[in-house]
Amino acid sequence: MKQSHKTILLWALLIFLFVMIYNLISDGTSGEETLDTTEFKTLLQARIDERLADAGEGPALSDDRRALAQRAGEIASVTVEPNPNDNATYVLRYEGSGEDGLDPDKKTLVYGEYKGTIENLLTAAGISYEVKAKEESTFWQSLLISWLPMLLLFALFFFFMRQLQAGGGKAMSFGKSKARLLTDHQNKVTFKDVAGVEEAKDEVEEIIAFLKDPKKFTRLGGRIPKGVLMMGPPGTGKTLLARAIAGEAGVPFFSISGSDFVEMFVGVGASRVRDLFEQGKKNAPCIIFIDEIDAVGRHRGAGLGGGHDEREQTLNQLLVEMDGFESNDGVILIAATNRPDVLDPALLRPGRFDRRIIVPRPDLRGRTGILGVHTRKVPLSTEVALEVIARGTPGFSGADLESLVNEAALIAARRDKDRVDMEDFEDAKDKVMMGAERRSMIISDKEKRTTAYHEAGHALVAKLVGAETDPVHKVSIIPRGRALGVTQLLPTEDRLGFTREFALNKIAILMGGRLAEELVLKQKTTGAGDDIDKATDLARRMVTEWGMSDVIGPLNFASGGKQEVFLGRDLPQAEAYSQETAQRIDGEIRRIVTDQYERARRMLEENRDALERVARGLLEYETLDGNDIDTLCQGGRLSRPAVVSKPSADAESSVDEDEREARPALFPPLGKSGTDPEPEPA
């Protein structure tokens, strides 16, 4: 029963109990007074004497006697209990003498002929009455009425005791595992819904085959892996692969996040680990999936958190449960992380995580398969080629491709289309890769011109540096995200590594934007800040990590200060090289960046006309692709119409006063009704 239903039932019981208690207290006792027969007859006789005195047929009454008569006139009801030998019980109710429009002499006799003394006295007192027989109740009715309040009180007491016990259980349930047992009815995912990670699928399918037919593997002395660690960048499908395992395994599947172990109380994490594996043993064979295990499995050590903390205690218990003194046969632990470098070495040793599955970003064939999975429920135009889209999205993860398909469907719906076409996918790709357009942003002509030359410098240098670079895909001066302009380079194939020449060309391209501003506008702006940061970082890694400097040689000088303190490792030590070496490293970084800066300068100076044409093309069309830039560099013209840009900030501020006065007012002046009709547009 849901909590809301319990609350409604509780309130209903309380209301019913209060009504019963009120009826028992008020029934027959509210405003009633018990009189014996003698006293009652005295009151009625005083009432009779008062009536006779008022009619002039009797003596005047004393004050005490008149008070008794007045009291008799206030009688509301009379209950007459006859002799025990009489089987009838009579209830007499009077309506008042002449009140409420009733006849004072009205008499109603419902049960038999009862002409006793009380009736005669009531008649003489002028009280209109009604005689009814009291209904006799059965034994069960009497028992129910007498015991019902007690039963209700007992039920409420029992209910509150249960609530208190449940509350106490919740207070002591911090050590219980929060793992959720997945059922067949919860969004079942199979391996048909997973694409682009064929090797990883083969690895986990073998584990599922072992669970379904263990004798096939144990007959040769093999054993099932105790743990499987899935590693890969964010969005590559590690959790989706785990959900597919849950849908295919046919055994109990417990799912929990690494952050669900540690709470504010000491010892809770270790207790939850013990409870999790106890549940697994009871349901063996089963699978336990821990998502984001780096939250609890980080490297043990000093760091800034001390040598012992709650996370370390939880990790120790996890290590013992996975491969400790007691065996956990039939319990397979599957974990996922995108930070395998921070995991404790004891967690990664054989016997705990025997198998490590790499879930990389998909290649061309994998991206095509992922697009096919995500477009099953999307109506596509006949011109849509998923392989073409996959070729244009190198480096995209599965989550990126799902977002691309969703954005394309939303764009097509916004344009009132019945099917999604290639134009929608192209716009969606630009939105995912470069950010959403901010066309409503008003930019001055000066800022727009600066942005155009900046992006033209990037694009032109990318065209001139040679083949060892990514080709220009699109250049735009439409503000996207936090940038005023974007130059997008898109590789034609998956790039797993690059050469020294590629890195140098990358630095030259980054410097092209600042150089174009200097050559044409004779100024330096803050727009090149991000380019300079990326160029410096790339040059530093060339010198200190990749051994691409002839002066420094193939040595690594980056590991000394590279460790991150808050990952639980030891505090980073001082730099493992001398001040002289540090100066040589800094000088080599400066030389690499400066050389490429001068190289890009020569390219732009020798191709100044091409730079002007590309910049003018950006100002006219706002967005250019690689073919457009080739056409402009060769002196050609684009055949498509120019974009009609919105008024800039300068144009907005230079409106004539006469034109401003001629505009109709949006609101009427104060004190006027403003009922005149708006002027029709010319």
Swiss-Prot record:
Highest taxon of the lineage: Bacteria
Xref: CDD domains: RecA-like_FtsH
Cofactor comment: Binds 1 zinc ion per subunit.
Periplasmic membrane side: 29-138
Cytoplasmic topology ranges: 1-7, 160-682
Topological relation to the membrane, as annotated: Multi-pass membrane protein
Enzyme Commission number(s) of this protein: 3.4.24.-
UniProt xrefs under InterPro entries: AAA+_ATPase (IPR003593), AAA_lid_3 (IPR041569), ATPase_AAA_core (IPR003959), ATPase_AAA_CS (IPR003960), FtsH (IPR005936), P-loop_NTPase (IPR027417), Peptidase_M41 (IPR000642), Peptidase_M41-like (IPR037219)
Keywords: ATP-binding, Cell inner membrane, Cell membrane, Hydrolase, Membrane, Metal-binding, Metalloprotease, Nucleotide-binding, Protease, Transmembrane, Transmembrane helix, Zinc
MF terms in GO: ATP binding; ATP hydrolysis activity; ATP-dependent peptidase activity; metalloendopeptidase activity; zinc ion binding
UniProt binding sites for Zn(2+): 454, 458, 531
Necessary cofactors: Zn(2+)
One Gene Ontology biological process: proteolysis
Subcellular location, principal: membrane
UniProt keyword annotation of Nucleus present: no
Pfam families: AAA (PF00004), AAA_lid_3 (PF17862), Peptidase_M41 (PF01434)
Locations listed in the record: Cell inner membrane
Residues the entry annotates as binding ATP: 232-239
PROSITE patterns per the UniProt record, alphabetical: AAA
Parts of the chain that traverse the membrane: 8-28, 139-159
Record's GO cellular component terms: plasma membrane
Its biological purpose: Acts as a processive, ATP-dependent zinc metallopeptidase for both cytoplasmic and membrane proteins. Plays a role in the quality control of integral membrane proteins.
Protein family membership: In the central section; belongs to the AAA ATPase family. In the C-terminal section; belongs to the peptidase M41 family.
Name of the protein in question: ATP-dependent zinc metalloprotease FtsH
